Amino acid sequence: MIDRQPWSLQRRALLAGLAGLAASTGMGGNQLMVAIEQNTLKRKGIGLRACEPERAFPGFTLFAPHFVQNSNVYLIDLQGEVVHTWNMPYPPGLSGYLTKRGTLFYNGRTSEESFLSRFPFKGGVVLEADWNGKVLWEVRHPGHHHHGILLRNGNVLLHCMAEVPDDIARRVTGGMVENNMQSGQYAPRPQADAGKMYSDYLAEVTPQGQTVWQWRTWEHLDPTADGIAEVQAPRTLWAQGNSVYELPDGDILASYRPTSTVICISRKTGKIIWKLGPPTVAGQHGPTLLENGNILIFDNGPHRLDDSVPYSRVIEINPATNEIVWKYQDKPTWNFFSPRMGYAQRLPNGNTLITESSFGRFFEVTKEGEIVWEYVNPFFGRPFFGGPPTSESNQVFRAIRYSEEEIARSRRLG
């Protein structure tokens, strides 16, 4: 049995909301004046929002809130109750998941200063921890960001970033030369970045920290055909990766947001053996292989080439034809939109768990697109670049559902 905490997220949210109300009486004490919550997401409602237990896939959902003040990874049940917590030595950079051997594999954000420090997707360390949060080993890498995974051979595969050679950078199409936009994605560009371009490389690293394989985007992508697809994106970042996935044959699925590209890389030759790009996807995240051989993708949609309205959707792609064979999108389409991050997981019962990352919302849909479970992350924190208290965020890189048997096994082995 899993020890459940003696409080619910709903009760905590209610108590926190009541504690924050500033009340005063007027007109002889007959009128009650209360302060209105100024954080939009808190005001809309948090915690469990909907649940049909007979239609939702039974199990537990793991997630790590993405802000610097919290290093916890949470596991909740279908009722939104926290049933287990891992406390990590680093804030998330950006997520964690349970391994086949029952442990927690975690991407963390280190405090060391580097050119990645001004980006919210900075990483710096991956580690493996047991069920109680004890760190078994960790690997640091100054270029690591977004996502890393534990390979079947026991090594780790990391998304890393480095400067693109000048002769290649000059040929990359798209993007804005000057980018002074203030947003949650980029801190103000320091003068040192002027004229520079960074792009991704994959690094396979042993648990002892030895790099045994690398794959550099600028050596394989076409600067013209695979240019920066996002209209307002800075030229500072070319092929910035956000997800990596090991296929059964050892080949690698990787996703690159600024180029709106998903590729499959041959581990034997290093060649790109499959590619999906715009207009099918726009700023996508999290491609995974399904049992039927298709690929599931969270398609963010901030700069669509075939629609003037930004919206997100989840699509299932037949890689033999690159055709969409299933999709989920809201009605109207703009009701569901995460401009950054996002994830989709196909569940054993055929449903799909979707992470609308920017708003900390996880929801499960049937094949027909009906919502059978919905939860909004109630853990808020200040974003990495500060701001007033009302700017607190509850964003989550990805949420993952595990069966009751998987959690029991993880507790036993991990």
What are these regions (language model features)?
Residues L18-A19, T25-G414:
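Histidine-/acidic-rich catalytic cores in large beta-rich domains
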Residues M1-L9, G17-A23:
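N-terminal secretory signal peptides
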